[in-house]
Amino acid sequence: MIWHVQNENFILDSTRIFMKAFHLLLFHGSFIFPECILIFGLILLLMIDSTSDQKDIPWLYFISSTSLVMSITALLFRWREEPMISFSGNFQTNNFNEIFQFLILLCSTLCIPLSVEYIECTEMAITEFLLFVLTATLGGMFLCGANDSITIFVAPECFSLCSYLLSGYTKRDVRSNEATTKYLLMGGASSSILVHGFSWLYGSSGGEIELQEIVNGLINTQMYNSPGISIALISITVGIGFKLSPAPSHQWTPDVYEGSPTPVVAFLSVTSKVAASASATRIFDIPFYFSSNEWHLLLEILAILSMILGNLIAITQTSMKRMLAYSSIGQIGYVIIGIIVGDSNDGYASMITYMLFYISMNLGTFARIVSFGLRTGTDNIRDYAGLYTKDPFLALSSALCLLSLGGLPPLAGFFGKLHLFWCGWQAGLYFLVSIGLLTSVVSIYYYLKIIKLLMTGRNQEITPHVRNYRRSPLRSNNSIELSMIVCVIASTIPGISMNPIIAIAQDTLF
C-alpha cells in the first residue's frame, strides 16, 4: 500500500515538473524546443515503464508517437523564423537544418507503427526499443543543427550507439550478433578517422571549432591550400561515408540489413542517410569552401562507384533485405549528385525532395517485408511468388513502392530523379548524370523481376510459403497497414504536384 502511494506521489510530482518545464519552453521560447519534447517523451517512457505493468503497453506506443508528432508540430510553427545560433555557437537553427530534422522525425513517426506487430510477435523488450529509437532520433536532430566540429562528432555517436544496440536487439540470433559486431567495429573505426580529420582542421585553423570560424582561421593562417587540409578532407569524407554508406564504404550495409530486425533496418536505412546528408552539406560547403574542386572530385568518385556497384550487385541478391541494402547504396549515389551541385542550381532542393520521396518508397517496401516475414518466416525473394493471389493489397502496394524506387512515371520517384538529374545536368555533371540514368534502368530490371513474382497467378509457380499465407489476427496489423498506406500515397501522389514541394525545399536553403 505504501509502495503504491509513493509511486502515485512520484508520478504526480514528475507530472507537475514536466508541465512547468513545458510551460516555460512554450511561452518563453527555446532554441531546442522540438528536441526537448523528445527528451520529455523519453522521461515519460521511463516513468511509465518503472511504475506500471504490461497492461500499459499501448501507452508506450502512444507517448512515443505523440512526442514525435508534437516535435514535428513545433518545427512547423518555427518555420520561416530568422536563423539563430545558440549554446556558444555549437547549435544553429534555420530552415535548412529544420527540413532535415523534419525528415528524421517523419522517419521515426512512420517506423513506430511499422514495428508494433513485429515486437508483439517476437516478444522483444518494448520500452528499450522505443527508448533507443527516440534517442537515436534525438541524436540525428542535434546533428542536423550542429555548428561546430565537436557537436558534429558527439551527436552522431548518440545516434550510432543506439543503432548498434538496435541492430543486435535479437541477441539470440547469430546473424544479429554478427551484424552488430561488424557495425560496431566499422563505426568505431570511422569515428576515429572522422576525429582525425577534425584535428587537422583544428590545428590548421589556429584552434577553431565552429564551422564558419574555421574558414576565417584558415584565411588568417594561410593554410587553406596546405597538405593538412587535404588530409582532413580525405579523413572526414571517409568518416561521413560510413554513415552515408556509399561504395566503397558500404561493406557493413548488407550484413547489418540482413541480420538486424526488419523494423530496425527500416529505421536505419533512412534516418542515418538523412542525418549524414545534412551534416555533409554543411561540412563540405563551409570549412572546405576553398577545396571545392577536390571534394567535388571525391564525391563524384563515390557517386559513380555507388551507382554502378550498388545496382549491379543488387541484381544477384536472393534476400529481399540484402537487395534493398545494395539498392540503398545506389540510391545514395543519386543523393550525392545533389550534394555536389549545391545550392547554386537547386541541388540541395532536389536532394531534399528526393530524400522525402525515398523515405516513403523505402519504408513502404520495408513495411511489406515486415508483414510478409511475420506470416511466412522467410525473406527470400523467390518465396514472394504468387502473393497477389493471397493478399492483393500487400502485393499492389509493394509493386507501387518498388516502381517508384525504380523511377517509373508517373510515380514520385520518377519526378524526384528527373529533377535531381536535371539539376546535375545544368551544373555540368554530364558523365555523372549519364551514369545515373543508365544505372536507374538497371535498377528497374530487378524491381520488375520482383513485381513479376508478386503477380504470378499460375498455381505451379506459387510457393508453399504463399499457399500457407494467412492474414494476422492481431489488431496491430492495422498499424503496419497504416504505415504502408501513408508510404504508398506519398510514393505516388506527390509526383503529380512537384512544383509546391520543390518551392518549399528551395525556401530552406541557407
Swiss-Prot record:
Entry EC no(s): 7.1.1.-
Transmembrane parts of this sequence: 24-44, 57-77, 99-119, 124-144, 150-170, 183-203, 227-247, 295-315, 323-343, 347-367, 395-415, 418-438, 484-504
Enzyme class: translocase
Keywords carried by this UniProt record: Chloroplast, Membrane, NAD, NADP, Plastid, Plastoquinone, Quinone, Thylakoid, Translocase, Transmembrane, Transmembrane helix, Transport
GO CC term, one of those recorded: chloroplast thylakoid membrane
Compartment(s) of residence: Plastid, Chloroplast thylakoid membrane
Catalytic activity, reaction form: a plastoquinone + NADH + (n+1) H(+)(in) = a plastoquinol + NAD(+) + n H(+)(out); a plastoquinone + NADPH + (n+1) H(+)(in) = a plastoquinol + NADP(+) + n H(+)(out)
UniProt record similarity statement: Belongs to the complex I subunit 2 family.
Role of this protein: NDH shuttles electrons from NAD(P)H:plastoquinone, via FMN and iron-sulfur (Fe-S) centers, to quinones in the photosynthetic chain and possibly in a chloroplast respiratory chain. The immediate electron acceptor for the enzyme in this species is believed to be plastoquinone. Couples the redox reaction to proton translocation, and thus conserves the redox energy in a proton gradient.
Subunit structure: NDH is composed of at least 16 different subunits, 5 of which are encoded in the nucleus.
Identification of the protein by name: NAD(P)H-quinone oxidoreductase subunit 2 A, chloroplastic
Organism of origin: Chloranthus spicatus (Chulantree)
